[in-house]
Amino acid sequence: MREYKLVVLGSRGVGKSALTVQFVQGIFVEKYDPTIEDSYREQVEVDAQQCMLEILDTAGTEQFTAMRDLYMKNGQGFALVYSITAQSTFNDLQDLREQILRVKDTDDVPMILVGNKCDLEDERVVGKEQGQNLARQWNNCAFLESSAKSKINVNEIFYDLVRQINRKTPVPGKARKKSSCQLL
């Protein structure tokens, strides 16, 4: 079974843990409890393939920056999450993306831009078009709006990253047995 290392990044309070826990455990975490770093393993089926996802739920961008390079180096796919209710969380993502590309030393990194808390439409300050435009600027990066509370597009975030990783590095075919031939 193929393993995937996915990293959830964004400012504090955008709902990174809520999205991850909703995906892995199917529950919504109401209480805000700042994360230092949590790791989850979840077996899922994506496009008829069994996959083991290792999901790293990270601290807000302002904290524990020393650890960030390490999980950017080891991660294969990245969910960059902002809250549609806080413009600053959207603005923070540009630097985060640039850091990922610098650490990975490539522009071709499986990534999805996620506008979270779309159930709070009355409190929206970041328009959907802003997210779509930023995703376009980022080499047509995938983009979704989600809500951990209302279970909107939660699974799709992680499944999309798996599909991007599969497109970038297809599963190798079954290795052929090496045979040897001896002439006498």
Curated annotation (Swiss-Prot):
Positions annotated as propeptide: 182-184
GO biological process: cellular response to cAMP; negative regulation of synaptic vesicle exocytosis; Rap protein signal transduction
Motif Effector region in this chain: 32-40
Top-rank taxon: Eukaryota
Family: Belongs to the small GTPase superfamily. Ras family.
Residue positions bearing lipid (S-geranylgeranyl cysteine): 181
EC top class named in words: hydrolase
InterPro entries on file: P-loop_NTPase, Rap1, Small_GTP-bd, Small_GTPase, Small_GTPase_Ras-type
Binding site for GTP: 10-18, 57-61, 116-119, 147-149
EC number(s) given by UniProt: 3.6.5.2
Compartments, record wording: Cell membrane; Cytoplasm, Cytosol
Keyword set includes GTP-binding: yes
Catalysed reactions, semicolon-separated: GTP + H2O = GDP + phosphate + H(+)
Protein name, as recorded: Ras-related protein Rap-1b-like protein
Function, in words: Probable GTP-binding protein with intrinsic GTPase activity.
Claim: NADP is one of the keywords in the record: no
GO annotation, cellular component aspect: cytosol; plasma membrane
GO MF annotations, alphabetized: GDP binding; GTP binding; GTPase activity
NCBIfam families assigned to the protein according to its UniProt record, in alphabetical order: small_GTP (TIGR00231)
Family matches, as CDD domains: Rap1
